Regions:
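N-terminal hydrophobic targeting signals that begin at the initiator methionine
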Residues: 1-2, 217
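Alpha-helical transmembrane segments and their lipid-water interface positions
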Residues: 49, 92-93, 208
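Juxtamembrane helix-loop-helix connectors linking adjacent transmembrane helices
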Residues: 25-37, 60-126, 144, 212-213
Length: 217
């Protein structure tokens, strides 16, 4: 494993937790400016991964599933959105009610404090960053390191779920984020189209910001 890949794995695995740790120093009710800065740092993780791939590993962007979109990209994104947003809740909603309701309610209460435009920013950028870290980079590099694509994908999916524990709690992370991660991973392995995953993931979050989270104030 090269130093560049080791750095990329560190960014993908520890970066989100580092941003959460920074947010703790901002207090319980940070200003919108502080939250914008924190989100910019979070987005910087994806930029760092792209720079590592291009200039550190000297690999093409399609080594993490990032390539020019086609009509198939849009159809894949649409199908993934339907599966994740409309069908998956039949599985996850009962699990959340049984194991992750407290975490869900606490997380939604925090999001409800935010203005609508900032929720759009969080949703639109959040899906892009998470897909870059967990699907594009971690799946591909862990698969290469282990020599088994299924193992790399499994480890990346577990990492995705665990990354949500500090904010949403263990119950919600296992009941909702883990199944969502499995679906996103299956689609990535099937089509290996990172942009399709980004579109579906970000769209789902943005819509959920207004259909699940109540209006501020």
């Amino acid at each position: 494993m090269s130093r560049a890949t080791a750095l990329g794995l560190l960014v993908a695995l520890a970066g989100p937790d580092a941003v959460i740790l920074l947010s703790r120093f901002a207090g319980e009710n940070p200003s919108i400016v502080v939250q914008l800065v924190l989100q910019a740092i979070f987005c910087g993780l994806a930029v760092a991964i792209l720079l590592i791939v291009r200039y550190g590993e000297r690999l093409p962007m399609d080594s993490i599933g990032l390539r020019m979109p086609t009509r198939a990209t849009l159809s894949t994104a649409a199908l993934l959105f339907v599966v994740g947003f409309f069908l998956l809740p039949f599985v996850t909603d009962p699990l959340v009610r049984a194991f992750g309701l407290d975490g869900a309610q606490a997380g939604i209460a925090e999001l409800a404090k935010l203005p609508g435009w900032f929720r759009v920013v969080l949703g639109a950028t959040g899906g892009v960053v998470e897909e870059t870290l967990y699907r594009g980079y971690l799946i591909e590099r862990l698969a290469a390191l282990t020599g088994r694509r299924w193992l790399g994908a499994s480890l990346a999916t577990v990492a995705f779920a665990l990354a949500h524990v500090p904010t949403w709690g263990v119950g919600f992370a296992l009941a909702a984020d883990l199944p969502a991660g499995i679906v996103l991973t299956v689609f990535y392995l099937w089509r290996r189209d990172l942009i399709a995953n980004m579109l579906a993931h970000s769209t789902s979050i943005v819509i959920a910001m207004f259909t699940i989270v109540p209006a501020a104030g």
